[in-house]
Curated annotation (Swiss-Prot):
<dbReference type="InterPro" id="IPR000706">
    <property type="entry name" value="AGPR_type-1"/>
</dbReference>
<keyword id="KW-0028">Amino-acid biosynthesis</keyword>
<comment type="pathway">
    <text>Amino-acid biosynthesis; L-arginine biosynthesis; N(2)-acetyl-L-ornithine from L-glutamate: step 3/4.</text>
</comment>
<keyword id="KW-0521">NADP</keyword>
<dbReference type="InterPro" id="IPR036291">
    <property type="entry name" value="NAD(P)-bd_dom_sf"/>
</dbReference>
<keyword id="KW-0963">Cytoplasm</keyword>
<keyword id="KW-0055">Arginine biosynthesis</keyword>
<dbReference type="GO" id="GO:0006526">
    <property type="term" value="P:L-arginine biosynthetic process"/>
</dbReference>
<dbReference type="InterPro" id="IPR000534">
    <property type="entry name" value="Semialdehyde_DH_NAD-bd"/>
</dbReference>
<dbReference type="InterPro" id="IPR050085">
    <property type="entry name" value="NAGSA_dehydrogenase"/>
</dbReference>
<comment type="function">
    <text>Catalyzes the NADPH-dependent reduction of N-acetyl-5-glutamyl phosphate to yield N-acetyl-L-glutamate 5-semialdehyde.</text>
</comment>
<keyword id="KW-0560">Oxidoreductase</keyword>
<dbReference type="Pfam" id="PF22698">
    <property type="entry name" value="Semialdhyde_dhC_1"/>
</dbReference>
<feature type="active site">
    <location>
        <position position="136"/>
    </location>
</feature>
<dbReference type="GO" id="GO:0070401">
    <property type="term" value="F:NADP+ binding"/>
</dbReference>
<dbReference type="GO" id="GO:0051287">
    <property type="term" value="F:NAD binding"/>
</dbReference>
<dbReference type="GO" id="GO:0005737">
    <property type="term" value="C:cytoplasm"/>
</dbReference>
Length: 333
């Protein structure tokens, strides 16, 4: 007999993020996974696609009414952008107490939904049952900028590079390994959705230029920050370390972080802190796994907090710098 306290279902479980969610939830001591919805995998055992899951569940094809009828304590929507609304409306009508966590961008600009970037917004959580999970790039940008947000002299300029898993499983140029081989693919160089998301959340204009790289997972976000007054590198490092001192998933390191050191980890690494001549410009680099802290891990943080559990329940984190040697920046002060 299950000793789980809360029942949970995933809609859109076939994708990379859905798979990461199943892996995390399988190890959660207070969650019972009761359905996973996927049209492509309909009828197939979940265990056949995710070796960490050892139960008997099979993937189902569930329309919004069928999802609502399950009356799960929690529903996680891991759907492509533009598909969340019918499920939200059905749950609102049939099972309004259900906690909904939406991983798409559909609800990130809706003031009726709590925007769940725990390290920056947990103080505004007051028991909301509708939670919008931030975007992967948006998470990296906000964490890289926030400690200096009030000392900026102009819009942050952010250069982002993501592994192709960020483009999802539906075939496109951005996840075509043949096109990406020996390549870096720029796209949506102005007005990217995450640019608007970060600008709205931080309350300042942000400029963002995303690129897709040949590696599978992980984001490198380089933020160019102009300052109102000169600050020393040490002072800036202290600002970041102090801001995130009580956040176990945020790792402040000295050198620029490398994306291959963050893959399959639940933490964010922020480092470099490279000063330009005159100390009124600093370049900060953040890395995270787009499938974990950029999606599934963050959803689990939000779920845990909403259910009254420790925020890091079932998140296997090791918040310390990697042991592999990283090069120091030649421009660091």
């Amino acid at each position: 007999m299950s000793t789980a306290t809360f029942t949970l279902g995933i809609v859109g479980a076939r994708g990379y993020t859905g798979a990461a969610l199943i892996t995390l939830l399988t190890a959660h001591p207070a969650i019972e996974l009761i359905f996973v919805s996927s049209r492509e995998y309909h009828g197939q055992p979940v265990a056949a696609h995710n070796p960490t899951y050892r139960g008997d569940l099979r993937f189902e094809t569930l329309d919004p009414a069928a999802v609502a009828a399950k009356r799960a304590d929690v529903v996680i929507l891991a759907l492509p952008n533009g598909n969340a609304a019918p499920y939200v409306h059905a749950i609102d009508a049939t099972a309004p107490p259900t906690l909904i966590i939406d991983l798409s961008a559909d609800t990130r600009f809706d003031p009726d939904w709590y925007y769940g970037l725990p390290e920056l917004t947990r103080h505004t959580y007051t028991g909301q049952k509708r939670i919008s999970n931030p975007g992967c790039y948006a998470t990296a940008m906000q964490l890289a900028i926030a400690p200096l947000r009030d000392q900026l002299a102009g819009p942050p300029q952010c250069f982002g590079v993501s592994g192709y898993s960020g483009a999802g499983t539906t075939p496109s140029d951005k996840n075509n390994q043949a096109l990406l081989r020996d390549n870096l693919m720029p796209y949506a160089l102005t007005d990217h959705l995450h640019e608007r998301e970060v600008s709205a959340q931080l309350g300042i204009p942000v400029e963002f230029m995303p690129h897709v790289a040949p590696h599978f997972r992980g984001i490198t976000l380089t933020a160019n920050l102009w300052l109102q007054r000169p600050l020393t590198r040490e002072h800036i490092k202290i600002l970041y370390a102090t801001r995130y001192a009580n956040d176990p998933l945020i790792d402040i390191i000295d050198p620029p972080p490398w994306v291959n050191q963050i893959a399959a980890r639940h933490t964010v690494q922020i480092g470099a802190f490279t000063m330009a001549l005159g100390n009124k410009r600093v370049v900060v680099v953040a890395t995270l796994d787009n499938l974990l802290k950029g999606a599934a891990t963050q959803a689990l943080q939000n779920l845990n907090r909403a259910l009254g559990l420790d925020e890091l329940t079932a998140i296997p984190y090791h918040p310390k710098p990697p042991t592999s040697p990283l090069p120091s920046s030649p421009l660091a002060s």
